[in-house]
Amino acid sequence: MEQEKIRIKLKAFDHRVLDQSVKQIIETVKRTGGVVRGPIPLPTRKRKWCVLRSPHKFDQSREHFEIRAFSRIIDITRFTPQTIEALMEINLPAGVDVEVKMRG
């Protein structure tokens, strides 16, 4: 029988805010007696756009934009009810998307 585990996936456009959130989650889990695996960095997703600067002609003048989405995975293998309670009460910075899944 597999042991239950919690997988937390974090996404953000700013890697500094993302790493700060990951650090906060790991400290909370360790403080409440849980065992953490990670953070596992996933590949950065880059999206690029090319836009004409002029509304009518002059195709040679273009502007390029890029946005990068950073993501990390944290696995919590052993946890207590206090760990889950502490995770629910964490205040993460704005701009960090969190997905939580229970497995096992």
Swiss-Prot record:
GO terms for MF: structural constituent of ribosome; tRNA binding
Superkingdom: Bacteria
Gene3D superfamilies assigned: Ribosomal protein S10 domain
UniProt cross-references to SUPFAM superfamilies, sorted A to Z: Ribosomal protein S10
InterPro entries: Ribosomal_uS10, Ribosomal_uS10_CS, Ribosomal_uS10_dom, Ribosomal_uS10_dom_sf
Transmembrane segments: none
HAMAP family: Ribosomal_uS10
Subunit structure, as described in the record: Part of the 30S ribosomal subunit.
Family designation: Belongs to the universal ribosomal protein uS10 family.
Record function comment: Involved in the binding of tRNA to the ribosomes.
Protein name, per record: Small ribosomal subunit protein uS10
Gene that specifies this protein: rpsJ
